[in-house]
A protein has these predicted regions:
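A short, conserved, highly charged catalytic patch centered on acidic carboxylates
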Residues: 1-149
């Protein structure tokens, strides 16, 4: 990950640290997200977790991880509460398999409000968008199981 990308999102170097960038969200009581460039991971703080677990750290392994990261940043900027954001929500998809929704935003009653499936620009997006138009794709599979969204 490049520092220019982080700076464009208004992340700044963390004081007394090397290769760690931080962003505080004043609209959420200074909630913060940290990015560690040495360890190549994102710490989404103490309120945004993966699939209802207590894990809030994501290792950056693929380009889509950066899309999810930027989307979470924008959700927080827009006023969505960190407590209402769940990453990689698992939904059963039949025959003993499951899928992972990139981002689920819940309402204040903890019901599904917004489902977001992130894709990188180009071939991955085009393929997913074509599938969405054809049969609903991944997103509508999740929606069928949680129609509050």
């Amino acid at each position: 990950m490049e520092t220019n990308f982080l700076q464009n999102l208004n992340f700044i170097p963390k004081e007394n640290s090397v290769n760690i960038y931080i962003k505080r969200y004043s609209n959420h009581d200074n909630y913060f997200i940290e990015v560690d460039l040495e360890k190549n991971h994102i710490n989404f703080g103490n309120k945004i977790f993966f699939n209802d677990s207590n894990n809030s750290i994501q290792k950056l392994t693929k380009a889509e991880d950066l899309v999810v990261f930027e989307c979470v940043d924008r959700l927080l900027q827009k006023g969505y509460k960190p407590d209402n954001i769940i990453l990689e929500k698992i939904y059963p998809s039949g025959h003993g398999t499951s899928g992972r929704l990139d981002i689920l935003v819940t309402d204040n009653k903890n019901k599904a409000y917004l489902m977001i499936e992130c894709k990188t620009w180009g071939k991955e997006f085009d393929k997913a968008f074509d599938k969405l138009k054809k049969d609903g794709g991944q997103l509508f599979t999740y929606f069928q199981q949680d129609k509050d969204a």
